Every structure is written in C-alpha cells, then in structure tokens.
Amino acid sequence: MTFNDKLQAYIQLTRFDKPVGIELLLWPTLWGVLFAAMGQAQQQGEGVTAGLPSLSIFVVFALGAILMRAAGCAINDFADRKVDGHVSRTKGRPLADGRLSAKEAIAAFLVLVLLSASLLLFLPIQVFYWSFAAVILAFIYPFMKRYTHLPQVFLAAAFGWAIPMAYVAIQGAADIWCWLLFLAYMCWTVAYDTQYAMADRDDDVKIGVKSTAILFGRYDVIIISLLQILFLVIMGAVMWHYFVPTSLGITPVFGLALVAMMFAKQNSACASRNALACFQAFLANIWVGRYVFALIAIACVWTTFNG
C-alpha cells in the first residue's frame, strides 16, 4: 500500500472526508461556549446582560470537538471491525476491508486523544479533571451496542460532554442551565442517531447489534418526535433564561419555530421507514445545528453591543 493509500485510509477511519459528524458535535459545543459566556457576563453584576467568549476559548473548543470526534470514529471502527463487513453501508471502512489493522486504529485513537489533551493546556485546571469523563465516554460508547439497546444515549453523553466542560472553562462550574442545555442536546442527539440507526436496522437485527431504532420498533417516529419536542421546550427555556434580561427579550425563542418545521419534515421522511429516507433525515440535522448556532450567535452578538 502506498503512502497516499494509507493516508486515505486514515482519513476515512477518522471521517475527515465526511464532515457531517464533525458539525453535529461542533455546533452544540459552540452553543455551550456562547451560553456560558452569556452567563458569566450576567453574573458580573447589575446592568451587564450579555457577553462573548474570548477567541482563544472559542478556537480551543472548536478544535477539541473536531479532534475528539475523529478519535471517536477511530475507536468506533475498532469496536465494529468484525461486524462492519456484514453491513452494506460500512463494509468499505478501512478496518473492515483490511486496509488498516486494529493496532493502527488504536494508535490513531490515542494520538487524537493526546492532541485533544494538549488543548487543555490553554484552559483552567478544572477542565482537565472533567476531560477524563469525555475520554471514557468516547471509548465505551462503541461497545455499548453489544450490551444495550441504548447506545445512542451513550453517544449523546459522549458528544455532549463538551457542554459542561465549556461552562467549567468559562464560569468555573456547571450550573443548572448548563445541565438543561446538556439535556436538550441529549434529546436531539438520541433522536437523530435513532434516524441513523433506522437506516441500518435490518442489517443490525441480522448481526445482533442493538440500537434505539430496534428498541422503539414501530413507535420509532413517535418517540423521535417526542424527543425533538423535548429539545425545543428545553432549548426554549434556556434561551428564555439568557435573553429575557436583554433587549431581545424572548425573540430568539420564536426562532425555534423553524427548527420545529425542520423536525416535521424529517419525521415525514422517516415515516416510510425507507433506509435512504431515514439517512437523509439524519443528514438534515446538520442544518438544525447550523441554524441554532447562528440563532444563538447573532443574539449574543446583538445583545453584547445593544444590551
């Protein structure tokens, strides 16, 4: 195998060729960074209603999200190396087709974790302690599909752990609004990863892999809808808390109406249970992440300069 072939295999292992997963982790991480900065500003005293994070914090958490997502993909392929070859969508992955070995996947995981850990040098020491949970969750998630029908919950916790880390980095502690944001993110992630699992459900049943799509059965779309409603309600409450003291009031909350329409379109597609339709619904969630980030970012910038 040539150097270019090996490099391409590593790129596929870490999914740098498929940025959808990066965005699904990146945008919510930045939601946390922005809200934590708002909270810190509001804690400073009367008359201060908004604030923005420092550029360094913003960059560190963005890079951390990208690197830890890649690490998660590497350990996921290591865990699934014996089953990916039996699933039509994953049989071309580099461990499944033999282009990379299990040792090379573990090495890639460790290198990416170490690179992520190096970013902690730019953050308060408390964040270092919180990072242990992030690594543990990222490592154990891929193995959960063998033992429980709720691997999507572990994925959501692993991906969402950057939110409390952002609050600890900026505010010094994870407050109730941090955990509500984390819960909202958990609901959204379990919903979209169930859509993803619906695309593989037939193959997963054959090879004995567990998922929420299998657990929910014919109630899958209903439960996804309920999770999405919970996301909207909790996110609306978080936005209410941060923006009501500002000149925008509850205006940003109304912006979630577009997200509700996005969710409705996704569920309409998933109702057919067609694998491609479910996968396309999953992919559509990058626009949810982008839009909610834009909504929060614009509101934070506006209120920082206009009160």
Swiss-Prot record:
Its cofactor is Mg(2+). Its EC number is 2.5.1.39. GO terms for cellular component: plasma membrane. Pathway: Cofactor biosynthesis; ubiquinone biosynthesis. InterPro entries: HB_polyprenyltransferase-like (IPR006370), Prenyltransferase (IPR039653), UbiA_prenyltransferase (IPR000537), UbiA_sf (IPR044878). It is found in: Cell inner membrane. Belongs to the UbiA prenyltransferase family. HAMAP family: UbiA. Catalyzes the prenylation of para-hydroxybenzoate (PHB) with an all-trans polyprenyl group. Mediates the second step in the final reaction sequence of ubiquinone-8 (UQ-8) biosynthesis, which is the condensation of the polyisoprenoid side chain with PHB, generating the first membrane-bound Q intermediate 3-octaprenyl-4-hydroxybenzoate. This is 4-hydroxybenzoate octaprenyltransferase. The gene is ubiA.
